[in-house]
Amino acid sequence: AFIEAHRPELARVVLELHLEHAAAEHVARDGAVVPTGQPEARWWFTSRLPRLEAAVRGAVEAEKLERSFVVPPTIFGPQPTTDGGFFHLEGVPLVNFLTAPFYLFDAMDTLDKIHRASLVPVTRAAVRIVESTAGVSAAAMRGEADGQTSVRGAGPLGLRPRKRGGS
């Protein structure tokens, strides 16, 4: 509904940043679900834009967010499986952070499953990523698509080659 109502404004959006989950890793042990003390693997679904990918990698490293993967939004198919997926299909640059614990959306998915030690560094990483866009226009951000851009109706992975030169 939001995209339909605001589609003309999407071209002016420099970055769509989504923070979904900061989950603690839990495993089944002796018939119980117990915490390991580690965060779940962290997924940073990031549009294939060199400037943005570098900003995310830099933020992850600076905040020592181990167990992080910086991956394209289309890694699992043309429709990203994240909250930001619909923005990606509209060509809006995206960073979507999440973890995907086995208990997600289950009755056992309770507040005690938050990896509290991740909250501050993930927040700081998000701030670093947003700060990396200072002075960057939406057009400039999209123009760095490393030969590929994501748009509605694009190729098999939601990608198509960027036009080069006069052709």
Q: Where do the protein language model's features map onto the residues?
A:
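Metal-dependent peptidase/peptidase-like ectodomains
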Residues: 1-94
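His/Asp/Glu-rich mid-to-C-terminal helical/loop segments that flank catalytic regions of hydrolases
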Residues: 99-167
